[in-house]
Swiss-Prot record:
This is Type II secretion system protein H. InterPro entries: N_methyl_site, Pilin-like, T2SS_GspH, T2SS_protein-GspH, TypeII_GspH. One of its GO terms (cellular component) is plasma membrane. It is found in: Cell inner membrane. The gene is gspH. The lineage of its organism: Bacteria, Pseudomonadati, Pseudomonadota, Gammaproteobacteria, Enterobacterales. GO terms for biological process: protein secretion by the type II secretion system. Component of the type II secretion system required for the energy-dependent secretion of extracellular factors such as proteases and toxins from the periplasm. Part of the pseudopilus tip complex that is critical for the recognition and binding of secretion substrates. Cleaved by prepilin peptidase.
């Protein structure tokens, strides 16, 4: 009698099941980014886009533009004139987009060397020549305090963005 050599269907299915389980464990462990990191990146992208628009506005208008940071949001500010003096006023181009400047509720914001506050003075000023007040903005998980992302401005565009768990070279 001729004996066949090869794998039975049961052996093949067992190997496929083991490979599938191993792959799913690896993807679950390493391939999934937590929600807070994703929101930090999305918020950083929105803030970076707003900062770029503020730089363009300062350059094109020839006037400084400020950015005011509070615990709940950032606001673009421009010089406004009153009868006695000038002061910083929020830029009101589109009130419908005002919510786009809010920080995500799951994020804690740490601004260095300044602190977010409720005054009407910007902590960061962008001059008409493109110079920016140097700052560092750390976004952390509000619940755990775990650092998620850092944006650093050394005085000019572009910002340096670093993820806390960044493993890229």
């Amino acid at each position: 009698m001729n004996q066949q050599r090869g794998f039975t269907l049961l052996e093949m299915m067992l190997v496929l099941a083991l490979v599938a389980i191993t792959a799913s464990v690896v993807l679950f462990t390493y391939g999934r980014e937590d929600v807070a990191s994703t929101r930090a990146r999305e918020t950083a992208a929105r803030f970076t886009a707003a900062l770029e628009l503020a730089i363009d506005r300062a350059t094109l208008s020839g006037q400084p533009v400020g950015i005011h940071f509070s615990d709940s949001a950032w606001r673009i500010m421009v010089p406004g004139k009153t009868p006695s003096a000038w002061r910083w006023v929020p830029l009101q181009e589109d009130a419908a987009d005002e919510s786009q400047n809010d920080w995500d509720e799951e994020l804690s914001i740490h601004l260095q060397p300044f602190k977010p506050d409720d005054s009407n003075q910007p902590q960061v000023v962008i001059l008409a020549d493109g110079q920016i007040t140097p700052f560092s903005l750390l976004m952390a998980n509000a619940g755990t305090g775990e650092p998620l992302l850092t944006l650093v401005c050394s005085g000019s565009w572009p910002l340096d963005q670093t993820l806390a768990r960044d493993t890229r070279p």
